[in-house]
């Protein structure tokens, strides 16, 4: 199938629908896996930062991310296609493979849901979205960004605990958490 054929709309579909899969070569972590394999792991967070995996502390968050990337990548976790708006106003489509970030985001969010109040979660989501938008638009030096950073950093003080995750081929599931700051246990 050539590139023109890939971009041609399929019969019976609107012109906006494209069925274009990324080539297997586009993925760095594609590995031969046992289809029935699973691995249970735990992620340790302190003040919102990933500090360990399976109880092992890492010298830096980057080192923990690298380890998680290798372990989750072996399951081909984290592949996706993102469609979004570019700064010049057109739609863009990008394929990516991000095993560790997707797991960390989901695990971190579960921990936040347990240790932050409803109002903290609401404002963190909204301020986080606005921060991301301004950053994407190149507005890092905008003074309000420092205000947002102060609020976001303040919310992370109690985001401390362990989150449990099960890795399976092409997917993962966050299965539980423990935190001394869990508002459900108070």
Where in the sequence are the language-model features?
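Nucleotide-activated chemistry modules centered on ATP-dependent adenylation/adenylyltransferase
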Residues: 1-186
């Amino acid at each position: 199938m050539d590139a023109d054929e890939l971009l041609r709309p399929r019969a019976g579909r609107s012109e906006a629908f494209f069925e274009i899969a990324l080539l297997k070569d586009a993925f760095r972590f594609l590995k031969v896996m046992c289809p029935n394999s699973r691995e249970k792991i735990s992620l340790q967070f302190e003040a919102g930062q990933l500090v360990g995996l399976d109880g092992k502390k890492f010298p830096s968050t980057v080192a923990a991310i690298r380890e998680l990337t290798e372990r989750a990548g072996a399951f081909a976790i984290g592949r996706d296609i993102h469609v979004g708006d570019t700064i010049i106003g057109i739609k863009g489509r990008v394929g990516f493979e991000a095993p560790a970030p997707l797991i960390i985001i989901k695990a971190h969010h579960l921990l936040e849901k347990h240790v932050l109040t409803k109002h903290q979660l609401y404002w963190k989501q909204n301020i986080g979205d606005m921060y991301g938008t301004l950053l994407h638009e190149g507005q890092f030096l905008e003074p309000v960004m420092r205000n947002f950073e102060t609020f976001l950093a303040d919310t992370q003080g109690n985001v401390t605990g362990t989150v449990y995750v099960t890795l399976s081929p092409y997917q993962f599931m966050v299965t539980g958490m423990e935190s001394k700051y869990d508002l459900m246990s108070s």
